[in-house]
Every structure is written in C-alpha cells, then in structure tokens.
C-alpha cells in the first residue's frame, strides 16, 4: 500500500520540525562553545581547540555532527562533547578530564543556562558563570592530586 497524501504531509512536517530543532540545538552548542572559549581565554597558559563529533543519531533530530571543544591547561585537558538534545531538560553535554578521567555533564535548564550534573546524579549548586566553571575545570583535571595519600 502506498503512502497517502496525509502521510506525506506528516512526514514533511516532521522533517521540518526535526531540522528546526536540530539547527536550534547546533546554535545552542555553538553558543556554549563560544562562552567556554571566552572564559578559557582569560586564563594564562590555557588554550582551546575546536573539533566535531562522530555522527550523532537522534530520532527527533536525525543524524548530525556537533561541535566539540578541547580545553588545554597546564594540569591536563578537558573535552566538551555533546551527547544528545533529547534528554530531560534541553540537552546534555559531557565534560571529561584527562588525565583523571573524571567527568560531569552539563544539562541545559533554560536557553543559555547550564547546570552541572555529577556522575552521582547530584546537581552542583553553582551559577553558570566563569569563576565556578574554571574552578570545576581545575578540580576535574587535578582531582587525583586532592586525594589523600594511601
């Protein structure tokens, strides 16, 4: 049985919504990247490098590639990598550190407002501002140095 007129209209409408939502998500990620680059640029000895994810597949958005950011610091590196738009909230981005391999996730609560979610499922009670993010970045990269000696 072929596709009817209404089925074709639904498919076209869904494709338009998917494209609009995907483009909005990519704009959101670009804005996050710009914010983090501006914050990091103020730190002596820190630098950023942009990149792109492998293909991400989401039912509502289709297949797409998203921007990534690597933050180079004297004590290590942070990788900022989008995971998905369709997540409770308005998207999820993973932030993980090298050499510690510690990570947190950024959950977009409102446009331009991100909340930090730990692996324990606890949201950090910090505003989305430069100083708390830079402290978090340092803690993630050097967390093993803060552990008591055995």
Regions found by a protein language model. Name each.
Residues 38-42, 85, 142:
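Short, intrinsically disordered, mixed-charge
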């Amino acid at each position: 049985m072929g596709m009817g007129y209404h089925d074709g209209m639904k498919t076209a409408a869904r494709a338009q919504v998917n494209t609009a939502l995907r483009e909005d998500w990519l704009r959101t990620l670009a804005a996050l990247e710009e914010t983090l680059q501006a914050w990091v640029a103020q730190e002596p000895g820190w630098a950023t490098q942009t990149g792109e994810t492998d293909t991400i597949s989401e039912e509502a958005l289709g297949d797409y590639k998203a921007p990534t950011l690597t933050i180079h610091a004297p004590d290590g590196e942070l990788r900022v990598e989008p995971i998905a738009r369709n997540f409770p909230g308005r998207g999820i981005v993973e932030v993980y550190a090298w050499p510690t391999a510690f990570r947190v996730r950024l959950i977009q609560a409102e446009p331009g407002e991100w909340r930090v979610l730990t692996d324990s499922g606890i949201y950090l009670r910090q505003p989305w501002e430069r100083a708390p993010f830079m402290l978090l970045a340092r803690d993630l990269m050097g967390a093993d140095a803060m552990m008591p000696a055995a």
